Amino acid sequence: MKSAVIQLPGLNRDRDMIAALTKISGQAPVTVWQTETELPEVDLIVIPGGFSYGDYLRCGAIAARMPVMKAVAEKAAKGVLVIGVCNGFQILLEAGLLPGALMRNASLKFVCREVKLQVANANTAFTRAYAPGQIIRCPVAHHDGNFFAAPETLARIEGEGQVAFRYAEGTNPNGSINDIAGIVNGAGNVLGLMPHPENLVEAAHGGTDGRALFESVLGRAA
Amino acid sequence: MTIPNDIRITPELVAAHGLKPDEYQRILDLIGREPTFTELGIFSAMWNEHCSYKSSKRWLRTLPTSGPQVIQGPGENAGVVDIGDGQCVVFKMESHNHPSYIEPYQGAATGVGGILRDVFTMGARPIAAMNALRFGAPDHPKTQHLVAGVVAGIGGYGNSFGVPTVGGEVNFDPRYNGNCLVNAFAAGLARTDGIFYSKAEGVGLPVVYLGAKTGRDGVGGATMASAEFDETIEEKRPTVQVGDPFTEKCLLEACLELMATGAVIAIQDMGAAGLTCSAVEMGAKGDLGIELDLDKVPVREERMSAYEMMLSESQERMLMVLRPEKEPEAEEIFRKWGLDFAIVGRTTDDLRFRILHGGEEVANLPIKELGDEAPEYDRPWAEPKMPPALDAATVPAADVADSLLKLLGSPDLSSRRWVWEQYDTLIQGNSLQIPGGDAGVVRVEDHPTKALAFSSDVTPRYCEADSFEGGKQAVAECWRNLTATGADPLAVTDNLNFGNPERPEIMGQFVRAIKGIGEACRALSFPIVSGNVSLYNETLGQAIPPTPTIAGVGLIPDWSKMARIAFAGEGQAILLAGAPESWGTHLGQSAYLRDVHGRAEGAPPPVDLAHEKRVGDFVRGVIRSGTVTAAHDCSDGGLAVALAEMAMASGIGARIDAPVNSASAAFFGEDQGRYVLTAALAREDAQLATLIEDARKAGVSLIAIGVTGGRELKLGEARAISVEELKEAHEGWFPRFMQDGSLQ
């Protein structure tokens, strides 16, 4: 599987993501700097987590306006798989590639802990290696992960099966509406999620529940 | 308004710069004339306690700082220790006490920023952070506000920068009501052939300014941090800097990228006393003069004076000496990261520190003497008064189960989850143990088996009662915590927080603590490779308890054999290593005596360093051989709290024998050098007898005291407590306190 990891100033989980992709796919992703206007031919584009541009102004707002994001949008329109994790999710929202918004956590505090996720739709390109309804462990680490969408948008997301992951077993860490942790776009090729599957992919992490997300993509690409 | 350079130097102005009349006379003698206003500022920046260590230097020299593993001891931005395979760990701890009390969020944030910069300035990528925090009494009106601000500040900076916070401490004591302590630790990983130093080399080379622009924030910060607090504290807010973790993250990446090109000859971050300290350091170390043209310094405010620029403590700035032929390449890297890059001066051969501003020479000082000729004091010190030993017979028996629950839910021993869940503990994907155990553990990237363990320790109430034993104990506990994971303790960094050294009793605490620390470090081959001294932690004559924080680093050769505190399974024998026959004896200065009986009395538990080493070496051995399935040291709250923590971490209960003598001393005594271990053996198993015999031969007492299993912890004759009830007591206090100030 060929993958690309987008790099912007202030992103800081890019190294985690590169390590996870390398370990799981056996191939190091190419990295693409924010000023690039074209992306290489890849099966998967990942926007990792962090604090792009310091999260100043609004999380992901500045990053979404960098040249590389236009290229990401073009690829996404052509059906290339795109994953945005944490700040990457925020950037995808700001870029208009996913519906809804992420607000400050209900606690108003940064939260880093392990939560439980339910695979709400196992029929996406990103979740097919999971069983429908499967409960998995996954860490979160964010300050602004409180997902919100207007009623009609929310109805559409829910109705079309666009919710990929939900916080489960009362572990919603941020107040997200309907316990939403991750969503896909209407076409099903763009995934945004707050939790960090890349931090739970090997024995050293104390578990491998995050692996199947990448393996889902790998299965399609292989 | 611009501050002119020709302000008349009056005795009041000299005093306002924190310089004593005899110190000012020393300046006059040194330069043979009256200093300009900018020069006075430069002297005050270089000669304050914070930067010059004038009260502590004499005693710091007595500390052990070398060993076969030490690549760089104190004197650089951070210490450097070899971990084999061409790799090294670079680390330091530094205080940001004064600013954090004035403005908790920014004070703590910039403390984290400063220590991270110290580490990556040396060419290391930061891989772990810790924070040792001390606050006033929970019922003091400022405490809740300070805890909230400091924790948010640490998280706000560290999380955005992208370093996992894997350990730390939080304590409460009314003696910190007027002065909280924020000691920030950072460690990084580097190649031993890729370490960068601050010593400039070569005449006529460009001095380059990198990073963020210079503003008026933090002017005089180091001088502020070298004085006590009084009623005017609110006026000191402008001396606190403002942090920008985003710029620091960019600065990290740009610096590491630049270092890889071979362009860097010398590098120094701008910390306390900013441009002044960094430029003098680089020049003086390299036996070179430095000339700076302030008109070329990137500024974010208009009409800044030379005085302000030289004393600004704006964050996220670096000074470098670069190879001239690499200049375009270097500039391109910094532009890519959106950072300022400006050639602001050059190295010279005249050993002068010359500052030009607006075409005028505003300062011209001898560069070596600015650092080397700083005053040094042998301050008078007095043997501190020590409380008499506790007569254990005066401590009435209390219910063991109730006492344990009370301790687990006390401000000092309750779970710190509320704090560390606001820190990113997982970023970088290498965290093997996060806060809640004996030490934070991070694996070494690109190595199949190695990991590093980190722990920060000190027990201020021990230091207050006997600063010599307290100093020893801080080192021993740190060594013990690292050992309990199976690590080889490598080296430490110390952060010595005390009151006003001009008072002989405070100086006495300092001197005796240093002696204790030195003795323990020598006995345990645990050298000090970096550190920081914070004095004048005092408000209106009330000093903090002596708080010499010790942060240590250990190496785990194979993390698959690392120990954790959680019970590993049911039906496993529980062993107590290094304990006296009656398990525990020492209640003086114990958490039990204070929190259950309301008495702060007695001498602290003494540390027998030879015993400490013997027990620790044995424990490390049985962890690595795989005999031991869980390990935890006994510290605050003694054996009972250690067992409860092992149960809570696993959800598995335990049944402990009834102690032969006093149950309170056995379960709550804070005797040193003890560990609780478990082995996957039944109590009657012959292998267990062999293990105990092996320990005896090594001069280590190893006593089987119980068995894991079930969902309850039963301590001897005491009523059994469910693990759920333990957790409820343990997890409840902190969130309740932070929610509504509840003290229960």
UniProtKB/Swiss-Prot annotation, chain A:
Active site per UniProt: C86 (nucleophile), H196, E198
Annotated pathway: Purine metabolism; IMP biosynthesis via de novo pathway; 5-amino-1-(5-phospho-D-ribosyl)imidazole from N(2)-formyl-N(1)-(5-phospho-D-ribosyl)glycinamide: step 1/2
Keywords, in A-Z order: ATP-binding, Cytoplasm, Glutamine amidotransferase, Hydrolase, Ligase, Nucleotide-binding, Purine biosynthesis
One GO-annotated biological process of the protein: 'de novo' IMP biosynthetic process
Gene3D superfamilies (UniProt xref): 3.40.50.880
Subcellular location field: Cytoplasm
GO MF terms, alphabetically ordered: ATP binding; glutaminase activity; phosphoribosylformylglycinamidine synthase activity
EC annotation from Swiss-Prot or TrEMBL: 6.3.5.3, 3.5.1.2
Subunit note: Part of the FGAM synthase complex composed of 1 PurL, 1 PurQ and 2 PurS subunits.
PANTHER family given in the database record: PHOSPHORIBOSYLFORMYLGLYCINAMIDINE SYNTHASE SUBUNIT PURQ
Record protein name field: Phosphoribosylformylglycinamidine synthase subunit PurQ
Organism lineage: Bacteria, Pseudomonadati, Pseudomonadota, Alphaproteobacteria, Hyphomicrobiales
Curated annotation (Swiss-Prot), chain B:
Principal location: cytoplasm
EC number: 6.3.5.3
GO molecular function: ATP binding; magnesium ion binding; phosphoribosylformylglycinamidine synthase activity
Active site per the UniProt annotation: H50, H96 (proton acceptor)
Pathway(s) it belongs to: Purine metabolism; IMP biosynthesis via de novo pathway; 5-amino-1-(5-phospho-D-ribosyl)imidazole from N(2)-formyl-N(1)-(5-phospho-D-ribosyl)glycinamide: step 1/2
Keyword match Metal-binding: yes
Pfam families linked: AIRS, AIRS_C, FGAR-AT_linker
Reaction catalysed by this enzyme: N(2)-formyl-N(1)-(5-phospho-beta-D-ribosyl)glycinamide + L-glutamine + ATP + H2O = 2-formamido-N(1)-(5-O-phospho-beta-D-ribosyl)acetamidine + L-glutamate + ADP + phosphate + H(+)
Keywords from the UniProt entry: ATP-binding, Cytoplasm, Ligase, Magnesium, Metal-binding, Nucleotide-binding, Purine biosynthesis
Membrane-spanning residues: none
Self-association and partners: Monomer. Part of the FGAM synthase complex composed of 1 PurL, 1 PurQ and 2 PurS subunits.
Its job: Part of the phosphoribosylformylglycinamidine synthase complex involved in the purines biosynthetic pathway. Catalyzes the ATP-dependent conversion of formylglycinamide ribonucleotide (FGAR) and glutamine to yield formylglycinamidine ribonucleotide (FGAM) and glutamate. The FGAM synthase complex is composed of three subunits. PurQ produces an ammonia molecule by converting glutamine to glutamate. PurL transfers the ammonia molecule to FGAR to form FGAM in an ATP-dependent manner.
Protein name: Phosphoribosylformylglycinamidine synthase subunit PurL
Organism: Chelativorans sp. (strain BNC1)
